[in-house]
Amino acid sequence: SYVFVDEDEEEEKKVSLEQVALKSTFFNNIELQVVKQHSSPLSPPPFMVGMAEVEVDTETGEVDVLDYVAVVDCGTPINPNLARVQTEGGIAQGIGMALFEDVQYTDKGKIRNNSFMQYKIPTRMDIGKIRVDFESSYEESGPFGAKSIGELVIDTPCPVLAEAIYNATGVRFRELPITPEKIAMGILKKKGTDENS
């Protein structure tokens, strides 16, 4: 397979997918990013609801996730134990995305914080208690009644934690990560606005 520079499909303006993969992976320190996606109409979406109990220090902006509860409808899980572990791992990643992970780029498009010394991810101590349950359903078009589960479990914690932090502080956050600095500044700004009202 080839990628063409323009629609003329001239031989001198094409490059193989193998060359694209090699150059982007081994000879360049810029990561590949997905810019297009496709979803099949025969693949019904899974659903998930999440709830979080958080504790927010209104002086420092520190957030402790005390308890996270998730209920997932992924059809009939083929392997319930693996589905549970995948859900717990996805929730942990989602908590990291919501509260810690801040990808920063240089002016040349390279990732600035490209090591775990600079890029904070949550530890088990940062995550709190995670409880997972599954809604019993059967998907006719899925294998053995199952639906997908992968991306759903990573996406749900961000809005759940943003709402929990809003309930604790009265401050809305619409950009991730919701860091202690952003929370503390948001609380100070809200106090100033409330005092001027």
Tell where the protein language model's regions lie, with residue ranges.
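Cofactor-binding beta-sheet edge motifs in enzyme active sites
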Residues: 1-197
